[in-house]
Every structure is written in structure tokens, then in C-alpha cells.
From Swiss-Prot:
It comes from Salmonella phage IKe (Bacteriophage IKe). It is found in: Virion; Host membrane. This is Tail virion protein G7P. The lineage of its organism: Viruses, Monodnaviria, Loebvirae, Hofneiviricota, Faserviricetes. The chain crosses the membrane at residues 8-28. Pfam families: Inovirus_G7P_2 (PF19978). The gene is VII. InterPro entries: Inovirus_G7P_2 (IPR045539).
Length: 32
């Protein structure tokens, strides 16, 4: 499985969304 620069950018973008959603959920839970 060879990864091109586009694949890496897509993976980083996806991870960024997951992390941002995770932090948002944690923050909402803390301040609920």
C-alpha cells in the first residue's frame, strides 16, 4: 500500500475532523 501526498493530506484532514469532534463532545460534556 503506497501512499501519495494526496492520501496523506486526506488522512490528516480526516484525523483533524475526528479530533475536533472529539474535543467538542468532551467540552460539551464538561460544561453540561
Amino acid at each position: 500500500m503506497s501512499m501519495t501526498s494526496d492520501d496523506i493530506i486526506y488522512v490528516v484532514f480526516a484525523l483533524g475532523l475526528v479530533v475536533s469532534f472529539g474535543l467538542g463532545a468532551i467540552t460539551a460534556g464538561v460544561f453540561r
